[in-house]
Amino acid sequence: MSAVGIEDGQKKQHTASSHEKLAHTTVKQQWPVSLRQQLIGTFKQPPNEKQARAFLADHYWPDGLISTLVKDCKKIPMHFFIVDDSGSMIIEDGKKIIKYGFNKAKMTKCTRWAELTESMIFLAELSEALLVPCEFRLLNGADPIVVGLGDDKGESFSFMKDVMEDTPAGTTPLCAQINAVVQSISSIAEALRKNNQKVTVMIATDGESSDGNVADALRPLTDLPVLVVLRLCTSEKTVVDYWNNIDQQLELDIDVLDNQQDEALQINGHNSWMVYGEALHRLREFGVSIKEMDVIDQSTLNSEQMHMMCHYL
């Protein structure tokens, strides 16, 4: 069963215009039983390494990093993405890479939404190549979208791209989506623990929650097999301080990521020997269970950690 908009256990078709109509509907709290069973059934299946290598080679990923990703997918068989599509995402202080010529690129200014869209589309396409399921939840828009099941000839991925073309608008109801993700993970937690696996939850946002206490919403994740990535889409001090305060309230390991350029500057300050490119940034956004990748922007790696990072790359 595909998940091109899920409602009452049935596959529901939407067009780009229906994204707007769904802006104020109730957040879906439960998966249909059939979808949950289908997802659990993928957890022991190996990722499609051949398709992944072909896709990532076109994006100039080194072989070592591709192997690291494929191996890690056996430990993390599913990913969740909570995507902030609030009105502030149209502010033009984002950054994205424009590629030109042979293996050349430059950083250019764009909206926060354009920066995030580029990332989300890549990760969704990566999910399709790997056949590793990912669920995308927009704060104000479409029903949850699951890609990477390989059962709908790319229909879910096409819908995902259509949704990301919409103009962001609305508030920042993070808590509702976090609560829904908590419930979804709880429903598959037994299967994950049995397989010694985890899932990742990436929250991509540029602001503060408009519908409650985010720390309270995130707290149940401390008892679930999950890794959390916070992808900040702004460097505004009030927002950074807000999320730092939440991090301090929780016994939850949160990997905080900025845009690629700012991450590269931070990493250069601690580990100047490392070239931080797009491939490594996308891998960290996708979410991996590699501790060294969590700390490269926070501290200088010791000799053993450096050896491991070189192995992963």
Sequence positions of predicted segments:
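VWA/integrin I-like adhesion module and closely mimicked acidic/polar interface patches used
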Residues: 93, 166-172, 207-250, 257
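Von Willebrand factor A/integrin I-like adhesion domains
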Residues: 161, 218, 235-290
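Acidic, polar low-complexity linker/tail segments
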Residues: 19, 26-105
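Von Willebrand factor
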Residues: 72-198, 200-204, 209-212, 233-241
